[in-house]
Curated annotation (Swiss-Prot):
PANTHER family: OS04G0344100 PROTEIN-RELATED, TERPENE SYNTHASE 11-RELATED. It comes from Ricinus communis. This is Probable terpene synthase 11. The Asp-Asp-Xaa-Xaa-Asp/Glu (DDXXD/E) motif is important for the catalytic activity, presumably through binding to Mg(2+). Its EC number is 4.2.3.-. It comes from the Eukaryota. Mg(2+) 1 binds at D317, D321. Belongs to the terpene synthase family. The gene is TPS11. Pfam families: Terpene_synth, Terpene_synth_C. Its cofactor is Mg(2+). GO terms for biological process: diterpenoid biosynthetic process; hydrocarbon biosynthetic process.
Length: 572
């Protein structure tokens, strides 16, 4: 079961039933599963088949430069360390941090030697900013707020803003940082006990949002969209920063639309869905994963090329999951191991077109990287696909034999079938930062960073889709494996423990964030963003709240941010 791109972002009351093709039905799955597959997104895609807006006049380079300079000046002349930290936090949450990377790094470097204060909000904010940007930050700075028993002082309960700041910081803790483990439990309890309706509106809004989803776990592009509105309500916001964020969001959204049009054109020309009536037609959903992983404008090629690979992955997943017989799946896997066009001749007709699409798309990416960096990377890309096929085949054999794996067996295999290794290895080469002969060797074996992110993705997918898959008679998922191992009979308890496992995996992932490594920061962030996107996509799947994801998709791809006609700004 591939997870990247598998969940429908749109809910429909009349799902479209794919039409079967003439080749024989699968002995691996029953064709009845096809009838519950989500509808294609042709209607949604058609809404952006033409440009949706004219570029506003305020996107002229001189206006953007004026806004950049105004924000930069304000950042460098801020009145106090806490004001500077708050401004950095806002810049990054608004999605324009890449414009001020040098200035932010210089300022954060100064904060390393900043004397800590008795202000809980400032201490927690400093810790979070440093750690989130891969600067050294030690959790013992919170010791001054704890009593001799290692518990946070009861007097802190009155400082709700400080509690909120500490709560957000605690989500960047590692598994060995007892102060942050205690901080999460203490602040969560305190914030939940507060009477939110009695709080000031601004504070209650922030508390509710944090308890629903802490900042560290949010998808950056979606956070930028939501925070632009929040920031506009702040009485002390920075006018040039706010306008810059709005204009930048709309400009990047327009770029995303153009990329999606290019992807849809490629997908139609490829013709896999026309030839394979059982295959999913979801280029939009595949693209949304890449927006979650790397939304920045300079990663345009990465999004386009990775979307292509994910779209092909979904078709391969459908062959393994719903259509191919076990003997044919063995042939398919062997052909991919050989990786040559002659191997294709032994395949059934419906597999040949998919094999050719995979072969050509992968080699095209390899050629692109060869021209850019002088490195031959096809063997590395090919390896991710071979591993994927072998993991799919393992899952097919489990299903045919009725074998229920242990949770560890399931997760080890599920990270691969979920597409994490394929997606992140491709991303590493496509982003290009730090790609050289030395760093290429870090892709073999797969980094722990990738494995942890992939496990989080796998578990969130199961929480979001397990009930539907159980109805189809799919392979046992992590919830079932865990319940079987621990002899749990209550489904809700099984789900609770899976969520606890996800939280534990995040502490390990945070450990990778601060561990000394030659891994480029771009791929570290991509790994974190993959896990974040999984939570956004799947966290409400078991609660039947898919419409909330639908709204998020509309906000990210289709609906620009509107604002009053621009007036001259007083730039500080």
């Amino acid at each position: 079961m591939s997870m990247i791109g598998t969940k429908s972002f749109f809910i429909s009351s009349s799902p479209k039933v794919p039409v079967g093709i003439s080749w024989g039905p699968s002995s691996y799955r029953t064709n009845s599963s096809l009838s519950v597959r989500s509808p294609t997104l042709t209607c949604s895609i058609s809404t952006i088949s033409q440009p949706t807006r004219k570029e506003p006049a305020t996107t002229k380079p001189e206006i953007m430069e004026e806004l950049h300079e105004g924000t930069r000046k304000e950042l460098l002349t801020s009145s106090s360390p806490i004001a500077t930290m708050k401004l950095i936090d806002s810049i990054q949450r608004l999605g324009v941090g890449y414009y001020f990377e040098e200035e932010i790094n210089t300022l954060l470097d100064r904060f390393l030697d900043l004397e800590t204060t008795e202000d809980l909000l400032a201490t927690a904010l400093r810790f979070r900013l440093l750690r989130d940007n891969c600067f050294p930050a030690h959790s013992d700075v919170f010791g001054k707020f704890m009593n001799k028993d290692g518990k946070f002082k009861e007097s802190l309960r009155k400082d709700v803003w400080g509690l909120l700041s500490l709560y957000e910081a605690s989500y960047l803790g590692t598994k060995d940082e007892v102060e942050l483990v205690e901080a999460m439990e203490f602040t969560k309890t305190c914030l939940e006990e507060q009477s939110i309706p009695l709080m000031a509106h601004k504070l209650s809004r922030h508390v509710s949002q944090a308890l629903d989803l802490p900042r560290h776990l949010r998808m950056p592009r979606l956070e930028a969209r939501n925070y632009i509105h929040e920031y506009s309500l702040e009485s002390n916001n920075s006018p040039p920063l706010l306008e810059l964020a709005k204009l930048e969001f709309n400009a990047v959204q327009s770029l995303h639309q153009k990329e999606l049009i290019e992807i849809v054109r490629w997908w139609k020309q490829l013709g896999l869905v026309d030839k394979l009536g059982f295959a999913r037609d979801r280029p939009l959903e595949c693209y949304l994963w890449t927006v979650g992983i790397f939304p920045e404008p300079y990663n345009s090629t990465c999004r386009i090329e990775l979307t292509k690979t994910i779209a092909i992955l979904l078709v391969i997943d459908d062959i393994f999951d719903t259509y191919g017989s076990l003997p044919d799946l063995i042939l398919f896997t062997e052909a991919v191991r050989r990786w040559d066009l002659n191997a294709m001749e032994s395949l059934p007709e419906y597999m040949k077109i998919c094999y050719m699409a995979l072969y050509n798309t992968t080699n095209d990416i390899g050629f692109m990287i060869l021209k850019r960096h002088g490195l031959s990377i096809v063997p590395h890309l090919k390896r991710t696909w071979i591993d994927m096929f072998e993991a799919f085949l393992t899952e097919a054999k489990w299903f045919n034999s009725g074998y229920v794996p242990t949770l560890e067996e399931y997760l080890d295999n599920g990270v691969t079938t979920g597409g994490t290794y394929m997606a992140l290895v491709h991303s590493f080469f496509l982003m290009g930062q730090g790609v050289n002969k030395e760093t290429v060797t870090m892709m073999e074996p797969y980094p722990d960073l990738f494995s942890l992110s992939g496990r989080i993705l796998r578990l969130w997918d199961d929480l979001g889709t397990a009930r539907e898959e159980q109805e189809r008679g799919d392979v046992a998922c992590s919830i079932e494996c865990l319940m079987r191992e621990k002899r749990i009979s209550c489904d809700d308890e099984g789900r609770k423990q899976v969520r606890q496992l996800i939280r534990s995996l995040w502490t390990e992932l945070n450990g990778e964030l601060i561990a000394p490594s030659a891994m480029p920061l771009s791929i570290i962030n991509a790994s974190l963003n993959l896990a974040r996107t999984a939570q956004v996509v799947y966290q409400h799947g078991d609660d039947k709240k898919g419409s909330s994801v639908d709204n998020q998709v509309q906000a990210l791809i289709y609906i620009p941010i509107s604002f009053p006609k621009r007036r001259d700004l007083k730039l500080l």
